[in-house]
Amino acid sequence: MSGLAKLLINVAAVILLTVSVQADTLANCTYEDIRGTWVFELGPSHKEGSKDWECTSTTQISVQYKVKITLDYPDIAIDEFGNKGFWTLIYNQGFEVVVGGSKYFGFSVFKDKTVSICSKANPGWAHDVLGHDRRCFQGQKQSPAVKFMKKTGRDSSLRFEPSINSEEMVASINKAQKSWTATTYPQFQGLTHDDFVRMAGGKRSRMLSRPRSVPITEKQDSVRGTLPSSFDWRKVNGQNYVSPVRNQAACGSCYAFASMAMAESRLQILTNNTQKHVFAPQDIVECSPYSQGCDGGFPYLIGGKYAEDFGLVEEKCNPYKGHDGKCSTESSCARNYVTDYKYIGGYYGACNEVAMMEAIYNRGPVAVGFMVYGDFMSYKSGVYHHVFENHPFEPFELTNHAVLVVGWGEVTSPSPDRYWIVKNSWGTGWGMDGYFWIRRGSDECGIESMAVEATPIFRFN
């Protein structure tokens, strides 16, 4: 047994003796749990521009309208009037439907910290496709029936420092393979278990299951042949279209940083580098109803839906603090919007390597989520892949860490390998000046399974 495996077993024993209560988590619902016929109940319209469009699990809806909608395979939505639209699962926690000129988004219901009720949607947000006629709605699935599902989590008060960032773990990683190099980081010393979890996505970004990247089609295989073997938006005709690396610190706001970075880069591309914005992740952490602050969130809902519904503000309007708080963004701050947000491939579960390459090359960097293992924290350089896949226990909670893919490349030494070029949000003192390479073409850690893109709307300043 390797030194790292022994170390992980020892860590497991400590954790198993320590953890005794469950953490508060969000729902854990699958595609088949959501697919079927639903009835959406809509409340009264909110005055446009008002700040009272708050739809939460405690919202009491005075039902004014009901609409029946069938959600079918793979992403088809049909309302009771015969209008045809589309829908997508949003990770394992909710869904969005666009049909009949209206949009509906809601989180699935969860109760008692462990039970997901996937046949119900918490009071969520409904509006027409232009962002007007804003209402709260709630959903009830009619058929087929869905059973309760249970899941577990860690105690959110746990204060245990795992042996991540230890010399022993780093030595074991470097001995086991030659594709990438691990190192220890002084800035990680003294961080708690909760700190590491937030850095890697936050407790509310945990996913008990994730989609696999779909097989590459014959048409996509021909598209691959038209794309360059390497590409990097930092180096296009002597221009850099990617904003600087930032540091999220010990706040689970990676989803906000990845979303802001995608909007920043795509706006630079759209304006031929004449507009270089730095958008405010703190506005997301404090103000977004579609995420959970420093406990996590997802780029589809922030770089996409929030940016379209509410807009993004400049960093100077709400400078980054790295912790939760009351929304302090001034209403006078200018808003920058996006449109046409979607999962790469069209819906959740339709992504793959070639679809990502095509989107990146033709439209700009994409925000992705991938599963973070403990060894990733020690990455220094090279083509990352998870080490010791079959060890008996992984002491680090698997979270969905959001980052920005800006390009791709290939290496021939020490062995041939293909990789993605990825911008992280842990500062320039981590990895390769804040970037990392990760194996491409094999859905390493799920990085090719749920990429997101959105198109910024150009503003004349």
Question: Model-derived features: where do they sit?
Answer:
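Cleavable N-terminal signal peptides of Sec/SRP-targeted secreted and luminal proteins
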Residues: 3-23
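Tryptophan-anchored aromatic micro-motifs
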Residues: 23-60, 85, 120-132
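Catalytic-core signature of thiol
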Residues: 147-461
